[in-house]
Amino acid sequence: SSAASDVYKRQGGYRGLAMNHEGHDMAKWYASNGFVAVVLKYRMPEGVHTIPLSDAEKAMSVIRGNAAKWNLDANKVGVIGSSAGGHLAASLSTLAADANRPDFAILYYPVISFDNMTTHGGSKKNLLGTDIENKELVDRYSLQKQVDDKTPKTLLLLSDDDQTVPPLNSILYYTALNEHHIPASLYMFPSGGHGWGFRYDFTYYQEVKDLIQKWLTYIKITD
């Protein structure tokens, strides 16, 4: 395949990187299925909220700018993110310049909303820093409010018993996508909690892989 899967991973609430089961392990699987997989080691915000998205946009620009050289289809570049990395992937999908938006997104149990009743407190605190009560920024990074007609097709994967990032985050994002007529699918597994990524011991490990493959075929990224 000439498609490029752009893999961003971060868990730990914009505080650290989970580079294995939510980074390199994912990338290896996508690569084994014909994708060029890129794992982005982006900078932590430390309260400077523009830093992660700036790094993500730069990565997209580099990938698309080298598409011909790397034998990639510049119109099949996707983003994958988990937890806080899912928030970054959704930020790229909604807030980035048009040229840097992905063509599809796969979000695992993402942080979406920064509303206090819904959010993951650590992600909000670490991204916004001293601006944590700034309503304009809270609204900006409540990404269900930023979905528009240019937001890419999205697959959401999560567990009903997630006690870290409330499932309502994904539901809000799916609803916003649906309202804008963006093709979207949401799969909520009955168990698994948070942070399972590509762990072999996740009960629905094989089902996740099957769903991803079928969805990528359905949206015509793969044959």
Where are these regions (language model features)?
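Active-site nucleophile elbow and catalytic-triad environment of alpha/beta-hydrolase enzymes
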Residues: 131-146, 151-152
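Catalytic nucleophile-loop/oxyanion-hole region of alpha/beta-hydrolase
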Residues: 18-25, 38-74, 199-207
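Short beta-strand/loop motif that positions the catalytic acidic residue
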Residues: 150, 155-158, 162
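Short substrate-entry loop that stabilizes the transition state in hydrolases
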Residues: 11-50, 87, 115, 163, ...
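Primarily recognizes the serine-hydrolase "nucleophile elbow" in alpha/beta-hydrolase
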Residues: 58-122, 138
